[in-house]
A protein has these predicted regions:
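Cytosolic catalytic domains that perform sulfur/thiol-centered chemistry
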Residues: 1-401
Length: 401
């Protein structure tokens, strides 16, 4: 599972993470990969029939299933069943510096039951299903994780730019809904973008421990964990506990902030809008008239339209291995030591790559909150139309059918 690859320890292991250089290929994906795409998808990961493939997993049933599947398709397969002993010996494992940001259903379930799973040292937890709209409109909240509350994205942003609201408004909305800087806040959503948008906003505000439930409600239900339909209303609190924002540095709010940063530190502006939006064929939104991108924007991979970021998701709709994204970025001239501002139309999609850089411990990454929406509102800002140098769309190596 992602969390074990990322850095969490297996229950019988003394350390977590993955063997250096290991390719991630999760058994759960087998149910989602189209038969006619299997070989090309595996090849994009570096798995081909001319190599011997060694599979390892701490779950021996999963290991049996995936190795059998590959062998049946004609791959040269070997199985390593002793990963737990490997992890407990002195052999090195690799993990992401902030792997704890992305949690599994099993981790969250342990916290709900009063346990102290790895990296959890708190005794105050709130779980939120995140989507747009108040409770009456929140379809995704109809069935939810036991004890979860609804988080309306309007609590942190407003039109017409859909940037973060003022610190005062955000503070009022957070304390009205029981959120303080020192509670552990776990966010999940049907559409990852909403939860990661809010995670970024809560980090900006000053929540010290905010996590993302990777896989959302689908992953929770697949793990046979309980849901409920009753509406839970948070108890308001008197104070957030500190001044908002505590981390203004992760937000570049408007076009002039971007231009200032470009002059000061060579900031690269990374577009996470679909290829048709990036090249100016469409604006992507019925409420955004302008087409194009801020001048100099680099395409940073995206999704099929403004509602998804498919290049960043695995077949089972969990987040893709950040190491694969880094390889894609390198081809685009996007590197770890650069100053990088991710943006999209209004800031939801951009939160996904920002979250991944945060997991990896990258230091100089931001969300440019205003995005294309704010840029196209003022004709004084330079616009690029069409792909630079007529480049064709780069391959995301993620076509599973």
């Amino acid at each position: 599972h992602d969390s074990l690859y990322n850095g969490f320890k297996d229950q019988n292991a003394t350390k977590g993470g993955h063997i250096k250089g290991a390719i991630q290929f999760t058994t759960a994906w087998l149910d989602y990969i189209a038969d006619d795409k299997f070989e090309s998808f595996a090849k994009d990961k570096g798995i081909s029939k001319d190599k011997t493939i060694v599979f390892y997993d701490s779950n021996l049933d999963d290991l049996q299933r995936i190795s059998t599947e590959f062998a049946a398709k004609g791959y040269k397969v070997k199985v390593f069943k002793d990963f737990i002993n490997y992890a407990n010996a002195d052999y090195p494992l690799e993990s992401f510096p902030n792997y704890q940001l992305s949690v599994s259903p099993q981790w969250l379930n342990a916290v709900i039951h009063g346990e102290k799973p790895e990296t959890y040292t708190n005794d105050k937890l709130m779980i939120f299903e995140v989507s747009w709209g108040d409770l009456e409109k929140a379809k995704s909240y109809t069935q939810h994780i036991v004890g979860a509350y609804h988080f309306n994205t309007d609590w942190i942003e407003n039109d017409p730019v859909w940037n973060l609201s003022t610190p005062k408004v955000i503070e009022q909305n957070l304390i009205k809904n029981g959120i303080t800087k020192d509670k552990t806040i776990v966010l999940y959503t049907e559409n990852q973008l909403a939860a990661l948008r809010v995670l970024w906003a809560l980090k900006w505000a000053g929540v010290e421990d905010v996590r993302f439930l990777n896989g959302g409600l689908t992953g929770w239900v697949d793990a046979n964990l309980p849901t409920e339909t009753q509406v839970n209303i948070p108890t308001p609190v008197a104070s957030f506990g500190t001044t908002i924002p505590q981390h203004p540095e992760i937000n570049l709010s408007m076009p002039y902030d971007v231009i200032k940063a470009q002059k000061e530190n060579g900031l690269k502006l990374i577009s996470n809008r679909s290829w048709d939006e990036y090249t100016g064929k469409i604006s992507g939104y019925d409420y955004i008239p302008g087409k194009g991108e801020p001048y100099g924007a680099i395409w940073g991979f995206a999704g099929t339209d403004s509602s998804n970021l498919a290049d960043y998701y695995d077949p089972d709709h969990t987040l893709r291995n950040p190491l694969e994204i880094v390889e894609l970025w390198k081809q685009q001239g996007i590197n770890k030591d650069d100053h990088l501002a991710f943006y999209c139309g209004t800031g939801w999609r951009a939160s996904v790559p920002w979250f991944m850089t945060n997991m990896m411990g990258w230091k100089n990454t931001y969300v440019y909150d205003g995005g294309w929406n704010a840029w196209q509102m003022d004709s004084k800002y330079p616009v690029q139309k069409g792909a630079p140098n007529n480049m064709s769309k780069p391959d995301a190596h993620n076509d599973f059918g």
